[in-house]
C-alpha cells in the first residue's frame, strides 16, 4: 500500500464530497479506538470544520483517556478541529430503566441494550451534525463493517459517508502510524464499547462476538 497516496486520496475525497453536499465539514464520534482515530485524523486534514464528539456510556477510564487525548492532540495540530464531550450515561440509564423487562423472559435484553448504546450515539451525532451543517462520518472498515457485517443497524452503521470502508484492518494500523495516532491507541485492545461490567454478561471482545481474530 502506498500509504501517503492513500491518505491524500481519502483526504481529497472527503473534501470533494463535503463540497458537493454543501456541507461545512464533518462530525466524528471518537471512542479511543483505532478506526475513529484514523477517520478523525483524515477529516482534520481536509481543512474543513471537524467536530469530534466523545460520547461515553459507562465507558472505562482508559477508553475515555485515549479519546480525550486524541481530540486534544488534533485540536493542537489543526485549527479547524473542535471537540465536545457529551456524557450519554444518564440518558442511557434512564432509557434502560424505562424499557426494563425481566431477562428470564427476554434473554436478548443485554444485547438489545448494547445495540441501544450505538443507536443513542448515532442520534447524538446526527443532532450535532444537523445543527452545524456537518456530515456524520462513519468509522467502519472493509473487514468488520463491510465484510462480516459487524455493526449495529441504525447505530454505528447509520452514517453519511464511510471514508475507510475500503481499507483492511492492517492497512488502518499502517495509516494510523503515518497520521501520528498515539501509540496508546495503536496498541489498545480493540473493543466496540457497547458492553461493561455493570451488565450481567462480561464484556465480550469483537473477536468473541465475531468468532474471528483481530490483526
Please give the residue ranges for each predicted region.
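ATP-dependent adenylation/nucleotidyltransferase module used to activate substrates
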Residues: 1-150
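Generic structural signal for individual residues within well-ordered alpha-helical segments
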Residues: 7-8, 173, 210
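Catalytic subdomain that performs nucleotidyl-dependent activation
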Residues: 113, 135-200
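Conserved small/polar residues in nucleotide/adenosyl-binding loops
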Residues: 201-208
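Hydrophobic alpha-helical segments, chiefly the membrane-spanning helices
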Residues: 212-215
Amino acid at each position: 500500500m502506498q500509504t501517503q497516496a492513500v491518505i491524500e486520496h481519502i483526504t481529497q475525497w472527503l473534501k470533494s464530497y463535503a463540497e458537493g453536499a454543501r456541507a461545512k465539514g464533518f462530525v466524528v464520534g471518537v471512542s479511543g479506538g483505532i478506526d475513529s482515530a484514523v477517520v478523525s485524523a483524515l477529516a482534520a486534514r481536509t481543512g474543513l470544520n471537524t467536530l469530534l464528539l466523545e460520547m461515553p456510556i459507562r465507558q472505562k477510564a482508559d477508553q475515555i483517556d485515549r479519546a480525550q487525548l486524541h481530540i486534544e492532540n488534533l485540536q493542537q495540530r489543526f485549527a479547524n478541529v473542535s471537540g465536545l464531550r457529551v456524557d450519554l450515561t444518564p440518558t442511557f440509564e434512564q432509557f434502560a430503566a424505562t424499557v426494563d423487562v425481566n431477562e428470564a423472559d427476554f434473554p436478548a435484553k443485554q444485547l438489545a441494550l448494547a445495540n441501544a448504546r450505538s443507536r443513542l450515539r448515532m442520534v447524538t451525532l446526527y443532532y450535532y451534525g444537523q445543527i452545524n451543517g456537518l456530515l456524520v462520518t462513519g468509522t467502519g472498515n472493509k473487514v468488520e463493517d463491510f465484510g462480516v457485517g459487524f455493526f449495529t443497524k441504525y447505530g454505528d452503521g447509520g452514517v453519511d459517508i464511510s471514508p475507510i470502508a475500503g481499507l483492511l484492518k492492517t492497512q488502518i494500523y499502517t495509516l494510523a502510524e503515518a497520521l501520528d495516532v498515539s501509540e496508546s491507541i495503536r496498541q489498545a485492545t480493540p473493543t466496540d464499547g457497547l458492553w461493561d461490567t455493570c451488565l450481567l454478561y462480561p464484556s465480550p471482545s469483537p473477536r468473541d462476538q465475531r468468532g474471528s481474530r483481530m490483526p
